[in-house]
Regions:
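A glycine-rich helix N-cap at a beta->alpha junction
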Residues: 85-97, 172-185, 208-212, 439-458, ...
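Glycine/charged-rich beta-loop-alpha catalytic/anionic-binding loops adjacent to active sites
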Residues: 15, 19-24, 54-63, 103-118, ...
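Glycine-rich ThDP/TPP pyrophosphate-binding loop and its adjacent helix/strand module
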Residues: 54-55, 62, 110, 114-298, ...
Length: 562
């Protein structure tokens, strides 16, 4: 396919760099430094390498692009504007304003073309690992004519200092996710100053140790053809995920702020903006974007997108279509009718039975755990292990990587086809809190299973007895938290999780609990299960404490207290 002319390439990059300064200046806040430096790389990625179609932003086989260092959102918004994803200059003028299509950090479901919600550093990188897992699994199950795409992620020094990046990179290397390419924005700068103030890691050696292919691109940030070559090399490599280490210069080509930490999050003032525009050779006018350049880039993006889609199956096959559809609550309840509610079980055991009984209705379910598969009830009968050699497996072994598990599940869900379910002990929800919070913000249908929900953990002692975790999760807007009391409520909780358009946390017991409810409280919010003819005290409980509350009521009744 014909490329854009060198003149259009140059002007497109100038537009991105101009917008990267103008939008934060208008908003009086924002981060232009990374966007300025990465403008050529980002333009080459979108115009020459990325498989995408602005006219079909939800095309199943599109390449996914994730900006893990989400503070550089103006870079992504400028690309979406240039490539015709529905953003216009008025949207960029409203950058970081209440209700605009261009919030301070990218938000999935809010801005067309944004795949995941990023901002807290490292989360987007781990989300990308989840998206790559989803692609690998679906390609193995349904073939490359249905699924064969890449996941591209830009991550910076801050992303790689965060602990979650270590967990997620280790998992990705172990699983040999070779459709995953990460571009390391290696500018050596943090908010406080040089990265040398706090970090001396050899990132290349670190990723090689994880099993990644590492491309040392060097200082080629202004050479479009060289950038294209390293991106294609990363795309075409097989057997390992790829890290492209690109030496960049934050704030370039500003004569005042290149390679300075002040370029990160302090909008250039009017004078500094003008001096940079003089270097770029663009007019000193806000939001400069010649219509003929924008039209040429958009037409080119549409042509590339149409060509890319023509190589793949036009429609998903029947099984994929089922995965994309919604299962009805009534059908789920029918599948669970045969569950034995006459036997006392731990609710972690009840969830295993509910999942097994409903499997035919949820072909997109993938289950996993952070090294507690059997303990938490998420070992699904008939599921085989997902691995580098068997990516068709539906049982994911995350290892002792709770934080990565949470964010990877978000990525799997936001890929758009599969429903991830992942389990660990409830006390370790603290390790996952940032990922769960972003699951709620992005409305991803991830099902978090937390067992060992109370002091019933017993002899493990206070380090493993979750006391404050329930209140912590309930405080997250958009997260559905369900703590079933018995097997009937657990079955209803499973129905609720599968029919909810967002994340759910199921809080389950280690210990056996008696069947004391009819399950209706899950649908209605609460249920009276014991009444007194002489009410004096109201006892309220949830989950495994409901049976304790009932015993307390009986004891009070024996003492004449109703």
């Amino acid at each position: 396919m014909a490329r854009l002319t060198p003149e259009i390439d140059a002007d497109a990059i100038r537009i991105i760099r101009g917008l990267a300064m103008d939008a934060p200046l208008a908003a009086k806040s924002g981060h232009q430094g990374t966007a300025l430096a990465l403008a050529p790389l980002a333009h080459v990625l979108y115009s020459r390498v990325l498989s995408h179609d602005p006219s079909q932003p939800k095309w199943l086989n599109r390449d996914r692009f994730i900006l893990s260092n989400g503070h550089a959102s103006i870079l992504q918004y400028s690309l979406l504007f240039l490539n015709g994803y529905g953003l216009e200059l008025e949207d960029l003028r409203a950058f970081r304003q209440m209700g605009s299509a261009t919030p301070g950090h990218p938000e999935n479901g809010h801005t067309p073309g944004v795949e995941v919600t990023t901002g807290p550093l490292g989360q987007g990188f781990a989300n990308a690992v989840g998206i790559a897992i989803a692609e690998s699994h679906l390609r193995a199950r349904f073939g490359a004519k249905q699924f064969d795409h890449h996941t591209w992620v830009i991550a910076g020094d801050g992303c790689f200092m965060e602990g979650i990046s270590h967990e997620a990179a280790s998992l990705a290397g172990h699983l040999k996710l070779d459709r995953l390419v990460c571009i390391f924005d290696d500018n050596g700068i943090t908010i406080d100053g040089s990265t040398g103030l706090a970090c001396s890691d050899d990132v290349s050696q670190r990723f090689k140790a994880y099993g990644w292919n590492v491309i040392e691109a060097g200082d080629i940030g202004e050479n479009l053809d060289a950038l294209e070559r390293v991106l294609q090399e990363g795309r075409d490599h097989r057997g390992q995920p790829t890290l492209i280490r690109l030496r960049t210069h934050i704030g370039y080509p500003s004569p005042d702020f290149t390679d300075r930490h002040e370029a990160h999050g302090n909008p250039f003032d009017v004078a500094a903006t003008k001096r940079t525009k003089d270097v770029l050779g663009i007019p000193d006018e806000p939001f400069w974007a010649p219509q003929e350049v924008v039209a040429a880039v958009r037409q080119h993006a549409l042509a590339r997108g149409s060509a890319a889609r023509s190589k793949m199956d036009a429609q998903p096959n029947a099984e994929v279509a089922r995965m994309l559809g919604k299962v009805s609550a009534d059908d789920l309840r029918k599948s669970l009718d045969s569950l034995p509610h006459d036997k006392d079980l731990a609710t972690r055991q009840s969830i295993t039975l509910a999942v097994g009984a409903s499997l035919d209705l949820v072909p997109g379910l993938v289950a996993g755990s952070a090294d507690l598969t059997g303990n938490t009830g998420v070992k699904v009968p008939g599921f085989t292990a997902f691995s580098a050699n068997a990516p068709e497996g539906r049982q994911v072994y995350y290892g002792i990587r709770e934080h990565a598990m949470g964010a990877v599940m978000v990525g799997i869900a936001l890929h758009g086809v599969l429903t991830p379910m992942g389990g660990t002990f409830f006390v370790f929800a603290d390790y996952m809190k940032p990922a769960i919070r972003l699951a709620a913000l992005s409305r991803s249908r991830a099902i978090f299973v937390f067992s060992h929900d109370s002091v019933g953990v017993g002899e493990d002692g206070p380090t493993h007895q979750p006391i404050e975790q329930l209140a912590s999760l309930r405080s997250i807007p958009g997260l559905r938290v369900i703590r079933p009391a018995d097997s009937r409520e657990t079955a209803e909780a499973w129905v609720a999780a599968l029919t909810h358009d967002g994340p759910t946390a199921l809080i389950l017991s280690r210990q056996t609990v008696p069947n004391v409810t009819d399950g209706s409280a899950v649908r209605h919010g609460a249920q009276v299960i014991r009444e007194s003819s002489r009410p004096q005290v109201t006892l309220i409980g949830t989950g495994s404490e409901v049976s304790v509350v009932l015993r307390a009521a009986e004891e009070l009744d024996s003492r004449g207290i109703g």
